[in-house]
Amino acid sequence: MIKFHVTIAAVLQLCFLSVCAQAADAPPPDAFRVMPPMAAEKPTITPYLKYQTEMAWHEDDLRRASWEGIRTEADLLNMQRELLKRLLKMIGGLPIEKTPLNARVTGRIRMQGFHIEKLIFESLPGIYVAALVYVPDDAGKHPAVLVPSGHSTNGKAYYQALCQRLVQRGYVVISWDAFGQGERSQFWDEKNHKSRYNLICAEHAILGNLAYLAGTNLARWEIWDGIRAVDYLLTRDDVDPERINITGTSGGGFQTTLIAAVDSRIKVVAPSCYITALAMRVYNRIFKDPDSDPEQDLDGMILNGLDHPGLLLLMYPRPVFVSAAVLDFFPIEGTQQTVHEVERVYEKFGHADRIGMHAGYHGHQFSDENQEAAINFLDHFNGMPRQRSLPEVKQLDDQTLQCTRTGQVMLEYPNARSLMDVIRDYFEEHKTGPATTLKQIYYSKSYPGINSWRVSEYQGAAPGHNEILWEQMGSTRSGDVSIDRYLLHHSRYLAMPLLHIHKSSSDQRRVLLWLGESGKVRESDWSDVRKYLDAGYDIVSIDPRGLGETRMPYKAASPDDPLLGQMDFDRAYVSPISGVLADYVYNSVLTGRPYLLQMIEDVEIARRFAAEKMNRNSEFEVTGTGDAATLSRAVAETLPNIKLLPQPDAHVVKWSDLVEQKQELWPIEYLLPGGAYIH
């Protein structure tokens, strides 16, 4: 027994000495740093954000050029048809069948001159919508207004003042909770009486990210709720079917715009605090509004000409009134630019009076002055008597306005279905379609042609769009190992840190592309790196755009996501609910080249450099640690002459599994629209 203890002690001592020797052998941290240390944590316009913004403006330039071909009204109507076709494709189409609404009124509230009906209807079987219908007391047919809820924890109750003002002006008004808000939480924690996330944007992030993978968008079902709300209004004897209108603010402004774009039964459209120019939104969202809201970022939206001018063009020749806020996080300059552009089209064909705008000097809200301007516009085009002031409102508490006994439709109705189930079913219905591969997607029309880019030494000038300029940033020798540091300048704005780690021997060795979940090799990875070096590999390792040394030195902050503020910098940066990396990803979706494809581009750029500068034209291998195993597998499936060297504990994201298992949280950098269909 004594001998056994001695043997164990000796082994432990040897292991300890081995670990200490490896730690002592590790180069200093500066050996792995290519660029100067980042400035103190602060909002920063990074090269990658600049790159994304310029891409968005370039694509919008192409859209504006296409509008120059609108010479006749027939040209305009042809473009409308094409844009609508693209929009429907982006959201994955609409449900084919209008199933029974099964509408029921669960209660009534008497008010001065009107009453409020508490309504439940099913937009799809088992998808329950909680709505309030504000009805004037006077008999006869009335114009109607849809008021989709913006982002608020209490949903429709938050917008009751607008609804009361409209009903007192003579409109029948229907306002409903969006998915993930008010009485329609999809992730309700019954024990703690709250959402597992939050009822402002977080549930939208969970739903919307999964919908992307299934080749659709959360907007599909938000639009469908609105279409079915119109269907409901048309069942009422007190509604004039020729005078259906819509207005809403923030997320309700988004729904207002998209519902009206798709449903021509809506005659007058008045979005608030939504319309801008998306390239400006790309530029400021991280700093002003970092919460994830995927329904507003349709796949290829800017690329396909459906920036906000394109959406408004779908309204023509219907009257449109845009309410805006000068201090909004939807940039007012973009609002003015978009409205003026669409205004010129309306003027060109004799409808200048059908488009208007009002901006209040305040933050993100449907202020009283904006409401008054919008309601006056609605009155004019609905033949309502002109009034000069807003009527008073009586604020009711949330519980009074609840349509359900329990406060949540998912608790109230045993057959209620979660939208996560519906998204999974959508995928199951569509997965038998034509197969596609990641390689086909990567080399699609948006591929920048890296395989033909020129590689040369950096001389101080910005790189062109089709060249890789390498800059030597230093070298560190540690025993028999050298770490050469490079900065690869490319794509006009971007600079990618790269490490070439190799033994001093001049022998030709295999090249391993080493990918870490946070970027390139770090000091803490040295023991693993040493094993690969001893096994006959040279290592090339990079920081993909937006990661590692190219991270933005900023921790996004949002009053709508208090959990974000409680996270440390590293966790907050990659949060899929709200954060810098998530916004980078959504920006890439808008411009039609998802972030995952851009990370593969970075690996291809590194490979081109290694082949040309280091004269390594043989087959490469690639490996990834942690979540980067997904990227390494994607690289091996996509780029020629790169073989996967799997890690034994690798965790590879499989998009179809995420959808089928209704996974709520997963690494946001691997968001790939339609990824679940890749074979």
Show the residue positions of the predicted features.
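Alpha/beta-hydrolase-fold serine-hydrolase catalytic core, especially in secreted/extracellular enzymes
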Residues: 24-128, 308-310, 316-512, 517-538, ...
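Alpha/beta-hydrolase active-site loop signature
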Residues: 152, 178-183, 206, 276, ...
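Bacterial N-terminal signal peptides
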Residues: 7-18
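Short beta-strand element of the alpha/beta-hydrolase
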Residues: 133-135, 141-150, 508-517
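Gly/Ser-rich "nucleophile elbow"/oxyanion-hole loop immediately N-terminal to the catalytic nucleophile
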Residues: 138, 192-249, 559-626
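Short amphipathic alpha-helix adjacent to the substrate-entry channel of hydrolases
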Residues: 158-174, 183, 524-541
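Primarily recognizes the serine-hydrolase "nucleophile elbow" in alpha/beta-hydrolase
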Residues: 228-303, 606-673
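The serine-hydrolase catalytic nucleophile loop
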Residues: 152-162, 178, 189-190, 517-530, ...
